[in-house]
């Protein structure tokens, strides 16, 4: 079993301080150095819009100022990390989500307000305004995890069930969103049945996306308690974690495994991905105890 060393964590911290956003500096400090969670909340404020949502390139692939579901998913993820997903700014963001939801109850992957602004090639505004599991499942799952009640969540949950229980093919990001939802939705029996069905799809299809990205078990099993753990043998999970430990680059970061379409996203995603790698390894007891 391979583990991160304290030196590896120090190298990651040096990369974060040298290259990443102020937000990731505070996320790293809060997660691994005993930093103040309030600083993460404060660092999110510049990305918040008057409509209650988040934008302003919080999610690096969408550079426009407007509030986007993917940016709100990111904000909620970071607030969940520091135990602050009950703050009032979450309620105002949910009010915004309610206002922009599609008729099916889901959120679009890209809101049309991105039109005219630089964005990744895969940030395509759909011709039909309809929900996507990628932001909807993740956001709904995080709200369920934190027992945060809001009018938006009911229809969004129904949408997620409809998609998860009927889908016949999924890409990596849809699967990750489904896992976040299934890990946290209250109906555990239904979640288990849906996870068994989804796991068979994941294991029998060739995973990947338009950019030819592949997955590793640790992408789906972010913690030992994840409902997706049953999709893999213990040996598969442990081997993938060994690979993750060994994937740290010379500069202290972990690699971004998708195309970088404009230079700044390399640093913005680099800090994000590096923190995510250490979080996963920490949850699987692959990091030194003094890290957390």
List each model region and its residues.
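Preference for long, amphipathic alpha-helical scaffolds in soluble/luminal domains
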Residues: 1-292
């Amino acid at each position: 079993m391979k583990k991160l060393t304290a030196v590896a964590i120090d190298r990651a911290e040096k990369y974060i301080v040298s290259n990443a956003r102020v937000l990731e500096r505070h996320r790293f400090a809060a997660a691994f150095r005993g930093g103040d969670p309030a600083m993460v909340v404060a660092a999110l404020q510049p990305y918040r819009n008057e409509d209650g949502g988040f934008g302003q390139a919080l999610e690096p692939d969408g550079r426009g100022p407007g509030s986007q579901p993917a940016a709100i998913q990111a904000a909620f993820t970071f607030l969940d990390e520091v135990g602050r997903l009950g703050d009032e700014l979450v309620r105002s963001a949910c009010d915004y989500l309610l206002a922009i939801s599609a008729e099916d109850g889901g959120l679009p992957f890209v809101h049309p307000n991105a039109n005219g602004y630089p964005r990744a090639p895969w940030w395509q505004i759909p011709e039909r305004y309809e929900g996507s599991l990628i932001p909807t499942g993740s956001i709904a799952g995080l709200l369920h995890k934190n027992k945060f009640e809001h009018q938006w969540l009911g229809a969004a949950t129904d949408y997620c069930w409809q998609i998860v229980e009927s889908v016949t093919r999924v890409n990596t990001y849809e699967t990750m969103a489904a896992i976040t939802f299934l890990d946290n939705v209250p109906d555990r029996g239904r979640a288990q049945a849906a996870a068994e069905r989804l796991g068979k799809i994941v294991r029998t299809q060739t995973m990947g996306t338009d950019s030819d990205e592949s997955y590793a078990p640790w992408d789906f099993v972010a913690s030992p308690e994840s409902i997706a753990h049953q999709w893999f043998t213990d040996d598969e999970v442990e081997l993938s974690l060994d690979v993750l430990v060994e994937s740290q680059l010379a500069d202290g970061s972990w690699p971004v495994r998708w195309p970088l379409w404009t230079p700044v996203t390399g640093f913005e995603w680099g800090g994000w991905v590096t923190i995510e790698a250490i979080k996963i390894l920490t949850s699987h007891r692959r990091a030194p105890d003094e890290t957390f």
